[in-house]
Structure formats: structure tokens, C-alpha cells
Amino acid sequence: MADYQGKNVVIIGLGLTGLSCVDFFLARGVTPRVMDTRMTPPGLDKLPEAVERHTGSLNDEWLMAADLIVASPGIALAHPSLSAAADAGIEIVGDIELFCREAQAPIVAITGSNGKSTVTTLVGEMAKAAGVNVGVGGNIGLPALMLLDDECELYVLELSSFQLETTSSLQAVAATILNVTEDHMDRYPFGLQQYRAAKLRIYENAKVCVVNADDALTMPIRGADERCVSFGVNMGDYHLNHQQGETWLRVKGEKVLNVKEMKLSGQHNYTNALAALALADAAGLPRASSLKALTTFTGLPHRFEVVLEHNGVRWINDSKATNVGSTEAALNGLHVDGTLHLLLGGDGKSADFSPLARYLNGDNVRLYCFGRDGVQLAALRPEVAEKTETMEQAMRLLAPRVQPGDMVLLSPACASLDQFKNFEQRGNEFARLAKELG
């Protein structure tokens, strides 16, 4: 446990995570100072009187006088003010680093471009099914510092690349990078390898590394070692087995669960289940209760969620597909009896959309492209694409065209912030319109 007594601590970024950092230091007898580039950041009204605050910009004077800077994942380490502080030898950490220095129970750590919230939640459910007192959070749900509890027997953390950049004391009992595809390229000017390097920090001092056999970018930098356990579609220690028209989860040659017993559907969810099982096994959770959790878990909202099935048409909300890799995962192995009506669009965060093209062949695909990067997406297959300003216009356009056997899929491959508050609002709007139009 670290000692922060007498330290000049500055926290950048408020919100729930920033407040959890403030509470963390106050509980240890240290009064931090807080700054946020927003004029009225969320949580400002909950800040105790004694805490000095500076809003609307960063305060370089405070930063250069600090002994310790706790930076929100929302601010890039490359920001000139942080860069100058780092050059001056000032320590910069994030809330996850503070958490790792204090946590007394083992940590299962999960990152990846896609699937991480589902896998994090699943491992948490597996622990609960085993009667283990578990804390689940990080980049999903509660900030990590709010989970700290002497009674906790296991922590399961979802970690973003931004959080990992400021974390060096993570010693996970089991850690995984589920996949690495282009995302946040606006934060990583040196491209995919720079983004991957941030993700790879999760393996440092991990007891077991769970890697994706189908994605070489998830391997440790020196390649697989004795700490590595793998999962994949057709290969890996944990893989899928197809026999007589049925699909099984298989571990080292042994069939452990028929996927028809699971409530989750889709090949990407079956591989998520394999990854979760590998992590749970590595953390020492009993296999039987982990498999039971797999049969009861219904999935998370906005992640390939069937919001309406009516007149033979399935309306699926995959609004959490905020990058190309996530939409690829939804389309890979997708079975549609009739026509796929695919809604794409939003803010593509400078990504290359071309990997989607291979899934959009054939006569039974229609594209409806909207938002900031709609024109670029429509160019993937212009002869079957319609361009509208908004998602609502796209849905009103496609609704009269759907036939029994068709699927309407919102898997936008883009962030939502050009037209929505967040992906949840976009997904809720899709669900509302599906119920109205379907």
C-alpha cells in the first residue's frame, strides 16, 4: 500500500472516476486539487468545499508544482501540459494504478477492442455463481476505486488502452487482450502498433495470459510463452467444435457445453464465452459453476441485442459496435434467411472501413448509411446503399421494404457522438423506432 502523506496531489478530470479519486485521497488524509477542461464538469456539485478546483482549462502552474498527477483516461499523455510534467519527472498515474497498489484480492483484467464488457460481466457472473464475493468494474459500471473492499475475494476489471497507459502495478492472476482492431486512431497518431502497445501492458507480471489464437496482435511482444492459454474459433486450448450441425465449447479436446444451452447467440459471443471460461479457470473458479453461469447469462444491452421479433423480421440493436472490428464480429458467420438491412454511420474516428467490404457481397444486403461518415460507408457498396442524414430517416426508409425472414441490424462501425449523447442513447432510439415501425 502506497503512502501519500504530505504529497501535493493534482487530479485531472472529474465525473464519477475523478470523484472516486478525490474520496480515495481524502480517506487517506490528503486533500487533492482538481482541474477539468470543462467549465461545469459532471460531479462538480459533489466536490467537498475543502478541495480546490480549476475548470475550463488545465492549470499548468498546479501541474508543475505537483508531486503526483492522477490523470483521467480522457486526457492524452501526449497533451503538452502532461508532457511537460513528465519531462520534469513528475509521476503521472491513473485511477487503476491507485487501485492496483491497494487491492488485496486477485485481479482478472480484460481489454480488447471489442467484447470486453461482455467478457468482464460474464467472469463476474461466473464468480457469483461460485459464491465468490466479487467486485466488477473499471471501464464498465463502477470506477475501480469504488470497488476497494476488505471483504472482496476477487476483482474483475475491464480496462481500456487509455487506462493501461498510466498503470504499472497490475499483477493480474489472469489477463486477456480479446482482439486488436483499429479504434481510437485519433488518440494514436502512430497507428495500430502504438494502440496495441498500450493494450500489451495488461500482460506485465500477469500469472496467466489468455490470448486469441485467431489474432496474432493479442500475443505478448516476444510471442506466446508458458504463461499463455489460447482461445479461438477453430484452434486454441479453448475452441468451438462443430459436429452434426451442433456447436460445442471445447476445452483441450473435451466438449464442455453445447451452445444451444446458452442464451447468448452469434459466433462472436461463443468466443467471448470461451475467453471468459479460460479466465475463470485461470482464476481458480470451479468449472461447474462457470458453465452454469454461461447457461443463464442473457448478454448486455446494445450488444447484438434482439429488441423486436415481429412478422418474421428480427430487429437487432448492436449500437455498442462503435468501431469496424466490432461490426466485423457481428457480420462474421451471420445467418439471415432473407435480406440483411444494415444500418451504418456516425463518427468513424479516422478508421479504415474497407475490412467490412468482404461481408457485404451478395444479393441479400442493403446498406443504410447516416451521420458524419455516411458517405464514406455508402462507398463500400454504392449500388445497394442509401444515404440519409439521420438514423431515424434510414429506419423510416427501410421499414416498408422488410419482408419475413429479413434482419434489420444496427451495427454502425462508428461512434455516436456526432448525433447522440452516447451509444446507449443511439441504441434506445433504435429500439424505440423498431417497436414503432416493426
UniProtKB/Swiss-Prot annotation:
Pathway assigned in UniProt: Cell wall biogenesis; peptidoglycan biosynthesis
Binding site for ATP: G112, S113, N114, G115, K116, S117, T118
Main location: cytoplasm
GO biological process, one term: cell wall organization
EC number: 6.3.2.9
Keyword Cell division in record: yes
GO CC term (a single one): cytoplasm
The family this protein is said to belong to: Belongs to the MurCDEF family.
Protein name: UDP-N-acetylmuramoylalanine--D-glutamate ligase
Organism per entry: Shigella dysenteriae serotype 1 (strain Sd197)
Gene expressing this chain: murD
